[in-house]
Curated annotation (Swiss-Prot):
Keywords: Cytoplasm, Schiff base, Thiamine biosynthesis, Transferase. GO terms for cellular component: cytoplasm. InterPro entries: Aldolase_TIM, Thiazole_synthase_ThiG, ThiG. 1-deoxy-D-xylulose 5-phosphate binds at residues 163, 189-190, 211-212. It catalyses: [ThiS sulfur-carrier protein]-C-terminal-Gly-aminoethanethioate + 2-iminoacetate + 1-deoxy-D-xylulose 5-phosphate = [ThiS sulfur-carrier protein]-C-terminal Gly-Gly + 2-[(2R,5Z)-2-carboxy-4-methylthiazol-5(2H)-ylidene]ethyl phosphate + 2 H2O + H(+). Homotetramer. Forms heterodimers with either ThiH or ThiS. It comes from Acinetobacter baumannii (strain SDF). The gene is thiG. Belongs to the ThiG family. Its EC number is 2.8.1.10. This is Thiazole synthase.
Length: 261
């Protein structure tokens, strides 16, 4: 079955796996893992990674060139709307007018849970300034609807806390977000292994974004390959339509035509 492309804002993608660039041991490992993942969208923490703002330091864009990948600047490390907006403005300047960004405004350093109030405030400002916003948010369906109605081009509810590896803790609420949404819904944060990614896709999500699950694996390149396959398998399972759940057994062999009785 031929799948449709993933449409985010004005852009089209074949891969439904998005990856980050943090926590790798060096740029070579980053490069190899991203290649193994098959990802087309690579997210970069502007406040933590050099993409040209520090000319004397290694530039991440040397291994993820914008000609090959869609660079998705993110506002990781921002705890209020003003700093998130400033970070997006810097990203646009560094990337020659690039308007697609991932907005995340965090509530505290312990949980890195989204600060929904500041997220809404930043999203409104950035959308008014012409940005296309992919937004990290809680798994609250009402907040997700509000962000979509404001004009965000993708909703990114957390599966569980960033970097926790706890998987998809609230599949039911994420399913509700997906059912209500007219823009792509991508699970962001909490994926720990391939089965978590597959579950997110089986729920009907349009994609999965991850970083630590790959970078913190014992073999990041092999895990990146596993995640690619998991996202593809989960997507195919969703499109195929799973069998209904039943309380009792239902034999798979016919009940007539036995050779022996």
């Amino acid at each position: 079955m031929q799948d449709t492309p993933l449409i985010i804002g004005s852009r089209s993608f074949q891969s439904r796996l998005l990856v980050g660039t943090g926590k790798y041991k060096d740029l070579n490992e980053t490069d190899l893992a991203i290649q193994a993942s098959g990802a087309e969208i690579v997210t970069v923490a502007i406040r933590r990674v050099n993409i040209g703002q520090n000319p004397d330091q290694p530039n991440l864009l040397s291994v993820i060139p914008p000609e090959k990948y869609t660079i998705l600047p993110n506002t990781a490390g921002c705890f209020d709307a003003d700093s998130a907006v400033r970070t997006c403005m810097l990203a646009r300047a560094l990337l020659d007018g690039h308007n697609l960004v991932k907005l995340e405004v965090l509530g505290d350093e312990k949980t890195l849970y989204p600060n929904v109030t500041e997220t809404l405030k930043a999203a409104r400002t950035l959308i008014d300034d012409g940005f296309e916003i992919m937004v990290y948010t809680s798994d609250d369906p009402i907040i997700a609807q509000e962000l979509e109605s404001m004009g965000c081009v993708a909703i990114m509810p957390l599966g569980s806390l960033i970097g926790s590896g706890l998987g998809i803790l609230n599949p039911h609420t994420i399913s509700i977000i997906k059912e209500n949404a007219k823009v792509p819904v991508l699970v962001d944060a909490g994926v720990g292994t391939a089965s978590d990614a597959a579950i997110a896709m089986e729920l009907g999500c349009d994609g999965v974004l991850m970083n630590t699950a790959i970078a913190a694996a014992q073999n990041p390149i092999l895990m990146a390959s596993a995640m690619k396959k998991a996202v593809e398998a989960g997507r195919e399972a969703f499109l195929a339509g799973r069998m209904p759940r039943k309380r009792m057994a239902n034999a798979s062999s016919p009940e007539t035509g036995y050779f022996f009785k």
